[in-house]
């Protein structure tokens, strides 16, 4: 489906010369004199190469038809990461390069959004927040309670996050998956 370049947003998938690209950033520039343009940074899905394109804001760009659905994570093996669609029970294998650094968040039964094109997974969206357990943390240094100080902690999935002083080993916490920041103590 053709769309004007100025309508492209982060996460959109475009088809340029038969290759799929996922939009990383899209900015519209309106100079005082001259034609407004849209600057788009993209990543080629096939090999991960980053590309930067500039179009006139009114130019037509081919937007790929992408199917986005919820999937449940099942397990990981030599083939890749296995997900199941909860309604039809269809299973799909996702390659490690699509999952990327988010693999540390995957737990059995976790619900994620997968974007597929021609039944091939092209991107994955993790939940905004996940609950993890702290395995080890440094002891509290006396006198650090006046300001909002944080201390490093190691989680069960191997992540290193900064947590408030009152968090100790064995505590379950909620972290933000985008910036790995502490959100709150888990309520379970």
From Swiss-Prot:
Entry's localization field: Cytoplasm
Protein's pathway: Protein biosynthesis; polypeptide chain elongation
GO CC list: cytoplasm
Origin: domain of life: Bacteria
Primary location: cytoplasm
Stated role: Involved in peptide bond synthesis. Stimulates efficient translation and peptide-bond synthesis on native or reconstituted 70S ribosomes in vitro. Probably functions indirectly by altering the affinity of the ribosome for aminoacyl-tRNA, thus increasing their reactivity as acceptors for peptidyl transferase.
Protein name: Elongation factor P
Source organism phylogeny: Bacteria, Pseudomonadati, Pseudomonadota, Alphaproteobacteria, Rhodobacterales
């Amino acid at each position: 489906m053709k769309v004007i370049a100025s309508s492209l947003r982060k996460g959109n998938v475009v088809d340029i010369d038969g290759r799929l690209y996922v939009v990383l950033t899209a900015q519209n520039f309106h100079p005082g004199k001259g034609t407004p343009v849209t600057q788009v940074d993209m990543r080629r899905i096939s090999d991960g190469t980053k590309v930067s394109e500039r179009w006139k804001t009114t130019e037509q760009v081919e937007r790929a038809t992408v199917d986005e659905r919820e999937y449940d994570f099942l397990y990981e093996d030599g083939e890749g990461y296995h997900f199941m669609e909860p309604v039809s029970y269809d299973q799909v294998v996702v390659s490690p390069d699509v999952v990327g650094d988010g693999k540390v968040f995957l737990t059995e039964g976790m619900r994620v959004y997968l974007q597929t094109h021609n039944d091939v997974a092209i991107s994955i969206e993790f939940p905004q927040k996940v609950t993890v357990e702290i395995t080890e943390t440094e002891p509290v240094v006396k006198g650090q309670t006046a300001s909002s100080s944080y201390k490093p902690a190691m989680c069960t999935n191997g992540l290193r996050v900064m947590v408030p002083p009152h968090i100790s080993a064995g505590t379950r916490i909620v972290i933000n998956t985008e910036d790995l920041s502490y959100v709150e103590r888990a309520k379970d």
